[in-house]
Protein backbone atom coordinates (compact mmCIF):
# COMPACT_ATOMS: atom_id res chain seq x y z
CA UNK A 1 0.00 0.00 0.00
CA UNK A 2 1.29 3.43 -0.93
CA UNK A 3 2.01 5.84 1.88
CA UNK A 4 -0.07 9.05 1.67
CA UNK A 5 0.85 12.46 3.05
CA UNK A 6 -0.48 16.00 2.94
CA UNK A 7 1.88 17.60 0.41
CA UNK A 8 2.98 21.11 1.36
CA UNK A 9 3.74 21.98 -2.27
CA UNK A 10 0.45 20.77 -3.75
CA UNK A 11 -1.69 21.64 -0.74
CA UNK A 12 -3.49 18.30 -0.86
CA UNK A 13 -3.14 14.66 0.08
CA UNK A 14 -1.00 12.71 -2.38
CA UNK A 15 1.26 9.67 -2.72
CA UNK A 16 4.42 10.02 -0.64
CA UNK A 17 7.97 9.40 -1.73
CA UNK A 18 9.28 5.86 -1.16
CA UNK A 19 12.62 7.07 0.24
CA UNK A 20 14.36 10.25 1.35
CA UNK A 21 15.63 11.81 -1.90
CA UNK A 22 18.14 14.15 -0.24
CA UNK A 23 20.56 13.73 2.68
CA UNK A 24 20.17 15.13 6.18
CA UNK A 25 17.37 17.02 7.86
CA UNK A 26 16.24 18.59 4.59
CA UNK A 27 15.86 15.11 3.09
CA UNK A 28 13.71 14.02 6.04
CA UNK A 29 11.58 17.15 5.67
CA UNK A 30 11.09 16.43 1.97
CA UNK A 31 10.29 12.76 2.69
CA UNK A 32 7.65 13.66 5.28
CA UNK A 33 6.02 16.67 3.59
CA UNK A 34 6.52 16.48 -0.21
CA UNK A 35 4.68 14.11 -2.55
CA UNK A 36 6.08 12.07 -5.42
CA UNK A 37 4.25 14.35 -7.88
CA UNK A 38 5.76 17.51 -6.37
CA UNK A 39 9.23 15.92 -6.28
CA UNK A 40 8.97 15.02 -9.98
CA UNK A 41 7.96 18.63 -10.73
CA UNK A 42 11.07 19.79 -8.86
CA UNK A 43 13.32 17.41 -10.83
CA UNK A 44 11.99 18.85 -14.10
CA UNK A 45 12.47 22.41 -12.83
CA UNK A 46 15.97 21.57 -11.59
CA UNK A 47 16.91 20.18 -15.01
CA UNK A 48 15.71 23.39 -16.64
CA UNK A 49 17.79 25.48 -14.18
CA UNK A 50 20.91 23.37 -14.80
CA UNK A 51 20.53 23.69 -18.56
CA UNK A 52 19.56 27.36 -18.74
CA UNK A 53 22.24 28.54 -16.29
CA UNK A 54 24.75 25.98 -17.61
CA UNK A 55 25.50 24.82 -14.08
CA UNK A 56 28.25 22.35 -13.29
CA UNK A 57 27.24 20.05 -10.46
CA UNK A 58 30.85 19.69 -9.35
CA UNK A 59 30.84 23.41 -8.49
CA UNK A 60 29.89 23.90 -4.80
CA UNK A 61 28.29 27.28 -5.61
CA UNK A 62 26.04 25.64 -8.21
CA UNK A 63 24.99 22.93 -5.73
CA UNK A 64 24.30 25.58 -3.08
CA UNK A 65 22.22 27.57 -5.59
CA UNK A 66 20.20 24.47 -6.53
CA UNK A 67 19.59 23.57 -2.89
CA UNK A 68 18.23 27.05 -2.18
CA UNK A 69 16.06 26.93 -5.30
CA UNK A 70 14.78 23.50 -4.21
CA UNK A 71 13.78 24.89 -0.80
CA UNK A 72 12.06 27.85 -2.48
CA UNK A 73 10.28 25.59 -4.99
CA UNK A 74 9.08 22.97 -2.51
CA UNK A 75 8.45 24.99 0.65
CA UNK A 76 8.53 28.67 -0.26
CA UNK A 77 7.13 31.05 -2.80
CA UNK A 78 8.47 29.06 -5.73
CA UNK A 79 11.54 29.15 -7.91
CA UNK A 80 11.69 31.66 -10.74
CA UNK A 81 12.48 30.64 -14.28
CA UNK A 82 15.53 32.30 -15.87
CA UNK A 83 14.89 35.61 -17.63
CA UNK A 84 13.82 35.02 -21.21
CA UNK A 85 13.12 31.31 -20.69
CA UNK A 86 10.43 29.82 -22.91
CA UNK A 87 9.39 26.19 -22.78
CA UNK A 88 9.50 24.07 -25.94
CA UNK A 89 5.78 23.49 -25.35
CA UNK A 90 5.00 27.21 -25.55
UniProtKB/Swiss-Prot annotation:
Cellular component GO terms held in the UniProt record: cytosol
InterPro entries for the chain: Fe_traffick_prot_YggX (IPR007457), Fe_traffick_prot_YggX_sf (IPR036766)
Keyword annotations of the record: Iron
Keyword DNA repair belongs to the record: no
Domain of life: Bacteria
GO BP terms, alphabetized: cellular response to oxidative stress
Transmembrane segments: none
Pfam families named among the record's database cross-references: Iron_traffic
Keyword match Nucleotide-binding: no
GO molecular function: iron ion binding
Role summary: Could be a mediator in iron transactions between iron acquisition and iron-requiring processes, such as synthesis and/or repair of Fe-S clusters in biosynthetic enzymes.
Family: Belongs to the Fe(2+)-trafficking protein family.
Designated name of the protein: Probable Fe(2+)-trafficking protein
Natural source organism: Coxiella burnetii (strain CbuG_Q212) (Coxiella burnetii (strain Q212))
Amino acid sequence: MTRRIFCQKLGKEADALNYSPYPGELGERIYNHISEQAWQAWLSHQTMLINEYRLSLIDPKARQFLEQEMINFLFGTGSEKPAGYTSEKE
